[in-house]
Amino acid sequence: NWIKQQCYDLWDNWETKRIENIKPDIIEYYDGVIFTGAHSSLTKDYPYLSRAEHILDKIVDYEIPTLGICFGHQLINKLFGGKIVQSPLGMEIGVVDIQLTLEGMSDNWFINSNTGKIKVYSCHEDIVIDPGVEFVQLAWNNYSIYQATAYRDFIRTVQFHPEFYKPILKIYIKKNMDRLKKQHNKPLHNVKSISKAIDNVRELPMSADALHNFVKYVRTKNKSG
């Protein structure tokens, strides 16, 4: 629902399905695909991963525009041969800075920024330490070297949450307060305290660019097709 809310004026024909309920053979008829976040860890194995791999095979065959968000970012990179681990730093949560690479700054449908550094909403503990084969790094920070990646012209993945709003992130920080206190005996890597992480939450229009630009790309490709 958050993705739909972020894109309410850009797209109105959505289908939301669990991976195990998607038939790979119909992927060619999709205008675009978004692999969302999930409360799961890809340091473990799941029965649906083989189906997800078949889905990605079809996405590549038909060059379907695809966006991976957080867990989706990790899933796509993993299925292309990348490696996912639990970060030794604990959770990265709150408003964080990411640095765009030259490829990220010049990418046509990633984020509209020529400053090199942007603030985004983050909430995750697992990270990509080796990207998928042929994936290009678009953004990084000291917590995760692969904050965003790209595969050819039609797949983009982001570790952060472009669908989040200010109230959503505050809820996640408060929900994980006890866990964060146990993980971060020293000050958080990106803020001086957990309460400061909540105070730092603000509206971040540029954080949503990765989602908005993806939908615009799907629309453009759909019209040209």
Regions found by a protein language model. Name each.
Residues 1, 30, 47-50, 81-84, ...:
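Short, glycine/charged-enriched secondary-structure capping and boundary segments
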Residues 36-104:
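Cysteine-nucleophile active-site neighborhood
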Residues 13, 20, 105, 109-117, ...:
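Short, glycine- and charge-enriched coil/turn segments that flank and shape catalytic ligand pockets
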Residues 81-167:
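Pocket-forming structural segment of enzyme catalytic cores
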Residues 140, 144-225:
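C-terminal and late-domain segments of enzyme folds
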Residues 1-64, 186-225:
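N-terminal beta1-alpha1 cap of cysteine-dependent amidohydrolase-like domains
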